[in-house]
Amino acid sequence: MTTVETAVGTTQSMVLNMGPQHPSTHGVLRVLLELEGENVIRAVPDIGYLHTGIEKSCEDKTYSQAITLTDRMDYLNPLGNNLVYCLAVEKLLGLEVPKRAQYIRVMLVELQRISSHLVWLGTHALDMGAMSLMLYCFREREEILKIFERFAGQRMMTSYIRIGGLALEPPAGWREHVKRFLDMMPPRIDEYEALLTKNPIWQGRLKGVGYISAEDLIALGTTGPGLRAAGVAFDNRKAFPYSSYEEFAFNVPTRTESDCYARYLVRVAEMRESVKIARQAMEKISDEGLIKTEAPGIIPPEREKMKTEMEALIYHFKIFTEGFSPPPGEAFVAVESPRGELGCFIASDGSPKPLRVHFRSPSFINLQALPKMVEGQLIADTVACIGTIDIVLGEVDR
């Protein structure tokens, strides 16, 4: 069964539609399941219900205008989307971002990673019947969103990371707010693990379920926690450091079991590592310094300069009305999102609008592993497998 059209049952089997409105698909994913009794013999994911045309829309905007579209792709990782897009444009322009801005970027995207994993853990636990975790995880996520609101004035679609640096200077009192959260988070993760990790019901639902070999994952191009749960310690922050990640000390959590339980353990361990990275970044951020590089005609000037310098006023007007024109060429950058390798390819023809924008979205590629995970499993285990892949349909369809 390779297409939706060929997913028809025989007299011995039944075809069941799971989704696109099923709550456990976490969006509008439709999965056609061919069943023999309660056993899944074939599965076909059917995507496209949330197609928004973000890539094509980016090609109709100037380079700066397209940033706001990237927020809405993986809506649980908007800062990560901003980052990969801005890094690609900066590579195209040959811009060097100030260290202070790089450290702030790292701190915020690691908080975003924790926030994304909290949504995953809460919703996955709810799918498995553990309602309390949903409430606890969203309690902690709320604190992260308050930090984002303090920095950017917006809780989710922040557009805070900009080409050449950041949109705004960090607000007064941010350091105490972030430190308070980072001090609070490790005991809360201990609390989650006390409820789940050794719980026999939780283990019974996840252990040995959804196994897929490392060879199959590599062949499919899968990345992220799913690949690391199969024993492959690949993480773009270590393999191809960006935004000064080479200056940070952290581990890449791995397991070897490659089942749903291993994927759960890897993500929980990743939250602990993100707390470490965010704390190191916070300590590296100085109270004074540049938050964006100085590049007249590309980076908007400071508002104070616009009051006294005519050139700054002209640059500001031209950047926001006409945009800037990178030299013709191509750039590709990959970062480590909460779901795996998130890449951005941009082709420039020398005009103020990109010729082509393409995102390598990890959710889209990781979803290919679902049939191999669920075939031969019980239908109830399909819910567990979808949960541990951790897909975001806005990124799958984009």
Question: What is the predicted role of each segment?
Answer:
Residues M1-R398:
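Metal/cofactor-centered catalytic core regions of large enzymes
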